[in-house]
Regions:
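Alpha-helical scaffold segments that mediate packing/assembly in large oligomeric complexes
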Residues: 2-85
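Short, surface-exposed loop and linker segments with low hydrophobicity and enrichment for Pro/Ser/Thr
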Residues: 6-12, 85-92, 141-144, 149, ...
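Internal mixed-charge
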Residues: 27, 31, 103, 139
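Short coil/turn segments at secondary-structure boundaries
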Residues: 34-39, 94-102, 122-124
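Short secondary-structure junctions and interdomain/linker hinges
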Residues: 25, 29, 33, 87-95, ...
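Ordered core of a single globular domain
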Residues: 78-113
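Sequence/fold signature of self-assembling virion shell proteins
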Residues: 49-78, 98, 110-193
Length: 193
């Protein structure tokens, strides 16, 4: 049993700690799968971008592909502008329109606007709201490098089953089963976009 302290944010038992640590790893994997997952991979699901790095195209999706050049500080604003230029005018003013980028792109963007002296971004005080040309930025952990998605957040769906018997996470002490000093973790859940 771990003792309480003012700055102790660990779980009181080892089992609870192990489950919380595993849940964080699972959450990171799900965040990655939301954007980059492929249905062909065992234990994964088809993400928004999938293996090709672009949405499945239909008449309502404009895939703007970077010409193979990685994003750097000097071209990040041009790439963001190129992505916004493909947004139809009927969508551009929508309140829930977001530009989804990863932390590399966000860091490059902040660095570039800081260099240009935009709204004192080099200071990054609490007044700054991340926007680009009037569109709010949504920084996403799981998104791959050199990708930009501009979409209404109401058009991106993530689903999971939280209430069934098929959703669980628990530890399994192997000492009673095979005499070993091992602990296994069982995690069952379903998710998809």
């Amino acid at each position: 049993q771990m003792k309480a302290a003012a700055w102790n944010n660990t779980a009181p038992t080892f089992d609870e700690y192990l489950i919380s640590l595993t849940a964080k790893e699972i959450a990171a994997g799900v965040e990655n799968a939301v954007w980059n997952g492929t249905a062909a991979a065992s234990g994964s699901f088809q993400g928004f971008l999938g293996a090709g790095g672009t949405f499945q195209t239909d008449a309502t999706i404009n895939n703007v592909v970077n010409a193979g050049t990685p994003f750097v500080q000097s071209n990040v604003i041009a790439n963001m502008s190129k992505a916004l230029a493909a947004v139809p005018s009927t969508v551009y003013g929508k309140e829930d329109l977001r530009m989804y980028i990863n932390y590399k792109t966000y860091r490059l963007y902040i660095s570039e606007i800081s260099k240009l002296g935009y709204v004192n971004a080099y200071n990054m005080n609490s007044d700054y709201v991340p926007v680009f040309e009037g569109v709010k930025l949504a920084v996403s952990y799981g998104m791959a490098d050199d990708r930009i998605v501009v979409a209404e957040k109401s058009n991106l769906f993530f689903g999971t089953d939280l209430l069934s018997d098929q959703t669980e996470i628990r530890t399994l002490d192997m000492s009673n089963l095979d005499g070993s000093n091992n602990v296994r973790i069982v995690a069952k859940y379903s998710a998809g976009v």
